[in-house]
């Protein structure tokens, strides 16, 4: 009698573990899908942001100046020495 009861408990715990694993998997897939869905609506590039934020073409020279400044701040590799130049 005890063996039958133990077998039922074991199969019930295996079923519970399977159900919990399946529920967690479905939950993670739903969260991942929703994150992809919401990320597709967010602008990713600077040009996309300017379209969505309503900025005009007059703001473009500032962006170009900022890009030049950012590029000049990047240390460059000296091809002969393989080190960064100051």
From Swiss-Prot:
Sequence intervals crossing the membrane: 18-38
Annotated membrane topology: Single-pass membrane protein
Protein location: Cell membrane
Pathway(s) annotated for this protein in UniProt: Glycan metabolism; exopolysaccharide biosynthesis
Basic and acidic residues: compositionally biased ranges: 61-70
Purpose of the protein: Inhibition of exopolysaccharide synthesis (EPS) and nodulation ability (NOD).
Name of the protein in its database record: Exopolysaccharide production repressor protein
Organism: Rhizobium leguminosarum bv. phaseoli
Organism ancestry: Bacteria, Pseudomonadati, Pseudomonadota, Alphaproteobacteria, Hyphomicrobiales
